[in-house]
């Protein structure tokens, strides 16, 4: 039993010393936006516009990077309610050659379910 316990780390080292992925091109620069807004503050209606303005500003500062990523549920509203805002961000980003990745909360058409 003791021998088996000693063998496990050696076997794990052999198995883990493998390339599990392969490079498929040059590295991609990514801008990751972080508003650092506490969750309990961000979702207050009184802070909605300030939060949206902050993320628009951070996005504009990152324009030109190939990929701009916002944290999951960074924007304090349902995607369904942010269509004009998201359209402006998308247009600004694509005009500068940037792609946006966002994690958004979305409501079903009847509003009975929410998805992330």
What is each PLM-predicted segment?
Residues 2-19:
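Internal/C-terminal transmembrane anchor helices
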Residues 14-116:
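Soluble catalytic regions of membrane-associated enzymes that act on cell-envelope
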């Amino acid at each position: 039993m003791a021998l088996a316990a000693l063998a496990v780390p050696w076997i794990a080292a052999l198995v883990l010393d493998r390339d599990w992925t392969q490079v498929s091109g040059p590295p991609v620069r990514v801008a990751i936006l972080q508003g650092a807004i506490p969750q309990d503050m961000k979702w207050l209606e009184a802070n909605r516009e300030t939060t949206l303005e902050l993320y628009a500003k951070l996005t504009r500062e990152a324009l030109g990077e190939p990929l701009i990523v916002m944290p999951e549920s960074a924007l304090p509203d349902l995607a369904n309610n942010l269509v004009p805002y998201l359209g402006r961000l998308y247009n600004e980003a694509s005009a500068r050659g940037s792609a946006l990745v966002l994690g958004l909360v979305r409501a079903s058409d009847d509003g009975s379910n929410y998805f992330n």
